[in-house]
Amino acid sequence: MENITEKLENFNKHKKLSVKVNLKQRYKHNKKKAEVCGECGSFLSFDLWRNKETNDEKRTLESANFCKVKWCPMCAWRKTRKLAGEIKSTLEQIEAQYKVRYLFLTLTIKNPPLTELRNTIKYMSNAFKLLTKNKLFKKNVLGYIRAIEYLGDETKSGEAHPHYHIILAVNATSYFGGNYISQAKWTELWKQALKADYTPIVDIRTIRAKNEKWKDSDSAIFETLKYCVAPLELVKLSQENFKELDKQTKGARQYNKGGLIKTIKPLPNATLDPELWEYMKTEYFNFVNGEYKKCATKKEADQKNHIKQKQKVSDSQN
């Protein structure tokens, strides 16, 4: 039987992070956005289903009020879950057709002033395009998913630390045969692509799946896609630096795909078979005093939370 406490655990964790980041205060200059951020995740409703054959229970998220702001830990987590599921589906399809291994590549650039972040992002993007056109890259890499992160753990005030986290799908036979690219070579290739007069920090490592159950691969997918700025780094930012970061990254793409990871589409998410699963009821929860608490009815939930807008949630994001 499904445990609702366990299901709510991750929502609780990320809602608490959202409270700590306090986007409502960060966007105090934008009243409407501040209100949406402040209410994000304060309401959840789940549909409860029962398996007619086994009596097992399952809950699916039916509606909620999410802000969808990129700095929000709750919304970033949900976006990561959705995209990670899609990427995993694509990688499994690639594995069925090719003998592949996966690499986790991190590419950096010298820290720019925060006021130059937008220009630096564009410069890195162009450099990465050059890297993908290199014959060694084209010969070995079947596909990639690339994500950008804007700050590091110890980025100085007034600076940015844009860097890429990338999962590479490589031809296992050729890459680990005669076409292996060492970390020193990856560093050289990235330095050339950047046209840099310094040696950038580059890290490359093999992702090893334990017992073919994707444990490490799943971890790498989440590491790559998790967020563009760690929540605790956002907390450290001054209001002035946050506004500049928000301005510099407006409209910037967080994720990019290439090769087979772009061309092979994820399979549709499985849905509950209505012949097998019976709808039982809808359960309502409000975030009160640091945790989600159940409400007896939808009316009670609305009265307590003063919800102005609720969003239907697709099965892929449950």
Predicted regions and their residues:
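Right-hand nucleic-acid polymerase module
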Residues: M1-A160, V170-N318
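Cys/His-coordinated zinc-finger cores
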Residues: I166
